[in-house]
């Protein structure tokens, strides 16, 4: 088996690029891409390193999208091997970012190099949109690059995001959409006082519980053939001073919606506000829009990806919209078709993150085949 993908993945993993750090990962990638004719455009916004790279000047534009940052390691004592010293054990490459998503980045680069060597005069353009701010607050990453591209009317036709989409084996699942994400930060106001004198206080916890119960039990929608029903989850709740004899003066609650295309963020906000008002709460609330839902239906990108996976692996892929959000949510509103295809996600964000070594070569072959189907017609 050719080990080019594994060696590049190891080089990337060895760089401790905990978000928003890049630690030279993009420079490594840029040097490889420049050598095969890409124009490299670094885009640094505050603490975030981004890269837009492009080979070709005409449509259609196929873009590989991904991130060089990784989540923190967690307890180092629980790792079998140092997280930034990539190690192969029983045919699995271990290290932080192996599956999310430095293995994918390596497969993208190798696939691109092989494709360009075989098809130097390919149709359209190949691009890369890479950020070091996907695992963090996602303020100065892909969103800022998209804003820059939109301002000069530079569009992508197709975007393939290297997120670890697979469930049991490489390519068994691709993500052809994602639910929207909306976070609410609620503060319920009361009056602090002594628990022995409740008539002189106003307990915000007691007042909020019925409203929160109604929100938690609410049926928001039925979903559809592509998306499960909208989910409401309380993520954090805090109230009280820690003392047993003090009624708190306020209660704070953070909750999140993962919502389908059957409802809008605006509709969810109106329904939440109506419930809070109906319970007579004195409250303040602010909203964080994390991303709109998107869906890529049948079309050139999904068709090419299905065919490529079938030809390389021998089995069919299953397009799904489950799971968390990705930077695909920022690309989709530009009008590009967006898919996610990457390694098995069983160990992502965990200690002892790893990826099957053979899967990296399979992934590179899938990526190369997709390029051929879209840019060699």
From Swiss-Prot:
Regions that span the bilayer: none
Molecular function, one GO term: cobalt ion binding
Positions of Zn(2+) 2 binding: 100, 135, 349
GO biological process, one term: diaminopimelate biosynthetic process
InterPro entries cross-referenced by the UniProt entry: Bact_exopeptidase_dim_dom, DapE_proteobac, Peptidase_M20, Peptidase_M20_dimer, Peptidase_M20A
SUPFAM superfamilies, A to Z: Bacterial exopeptidase dimerisation domain, Zn-dependent exopeptidases
Pathway this chain belongs to: Amino-acid biosynthesis; L-lysine biosynthesis via DAP pathway; LL-2,6-diaminopimelate from (S)-tetrahydrodipicolinate (succinylase route): step 3/3
CDD domains: M20_DapE_proteobac
Coiled coil: none
Top-level taxon: Bacteria
Broadest EC class assigned to this enzyme: hydrolase
Record: active site: 69, 134 (proton acceptor)
Stored Pfam families: M20_dimer, Peptidase_M20
PANTHER family, A to Z: ACETYLORNITHINE DEACETYLASE, N-ACETYL-L-CITRULLINE DEACETYLASE
Family: Belongs to the peptidase M20A family. DapE subfamily.
Function statement: Catalyzes the hydrolysis of N-succinyl-L,L-diaminopimelic acid (SDAP), forming succinate and LL-2,6-diaminopimelate (DAP), an intermediate involved in the bacterial biosynthesis of lysine and meso-diaminopimelic acid, an essential component of bacterial cell walls.
Protein name per its UniProtKB record: Succinyl-diaminopimelate desuccinylase
Higher taxonomy: Bacteria, Pseudomonadati, Pseudomonadota, Gammaproteobacteria, Alteromonadales
Gene designation: dapE
């Amino acid at each position: 088996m050719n080990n080019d993908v594994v060696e590049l993945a190891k080089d990337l993993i060895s760089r401790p690029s905990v978000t928003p750090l890049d630690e030279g990962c993009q420079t490594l990638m840029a040097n490889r891409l420049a050598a095969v004719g890409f124009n490299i455009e670094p885009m640094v916004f505050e603490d975030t390193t981004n890269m837009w790279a492009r080979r070709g000047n005409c449509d259609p534009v196929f873009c590989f999208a991904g991130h060089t940052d990784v989540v923190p390691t967690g307890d180092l004592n629980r790792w079998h091997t140092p997280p930034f010293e990539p190690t192969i054990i029983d045919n699995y490459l271990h290290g932080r970012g192996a599956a999310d998503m430095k293995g994918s980045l390596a497969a993208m680069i190798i696939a691109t190099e092989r494709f360009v060597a075989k098809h130097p005069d390919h149709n359209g353009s190949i691009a890369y949109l890479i950020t070091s701010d996907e695992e963090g607050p996602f303020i100065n990453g892909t969103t800022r690059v998209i804003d820059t591209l939109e301002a000069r009317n530079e569009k992508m036709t197709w975007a393939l995001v290297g997120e670890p989409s697979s469930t049991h084996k490489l390519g068994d699942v691709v993500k052809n959409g994602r639910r929207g994400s909306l976070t609410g930060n609620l503060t319920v106001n009361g009056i602090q006082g002594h628990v022995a004198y409740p008539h002189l206080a106003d307990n915000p916890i007691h007042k909020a519980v019925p409203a929160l119960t109604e929100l938690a039990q609410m049926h928001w929608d039925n979903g559809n053939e592509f998306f499960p029903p909208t989910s409401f989850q309380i993520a954090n709740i805090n109230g009280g001073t820690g003392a047993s004899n003090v009624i708190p003066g306020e209660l704070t609650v953070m909750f999140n919606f993962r919502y389908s295309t059957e409802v809008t963020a605006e509709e969810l906000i109106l329904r939440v506000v109506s419930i809070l008002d109906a319970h007579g709460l004195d409250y303040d609330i602010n909203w964080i829009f994390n991303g709109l839902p998107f869906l890529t239906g049948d079309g050139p990108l999904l068709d090419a990806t299905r065919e490529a996976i079938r030809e390389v692996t021998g089995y069919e892929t299953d397009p799904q919209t489950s799971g968390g959000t990705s930077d695909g949510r920022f690309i989709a509103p530009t009008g590009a078709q967006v898919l996610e295809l990457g390694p098995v996600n069983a160990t992502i964000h965990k200690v002892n993150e790893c990826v099957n070594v053979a899967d990296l070569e399979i992934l590179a072959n899938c990526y190369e085949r997709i390029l051929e189907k879209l840019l060699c017609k």
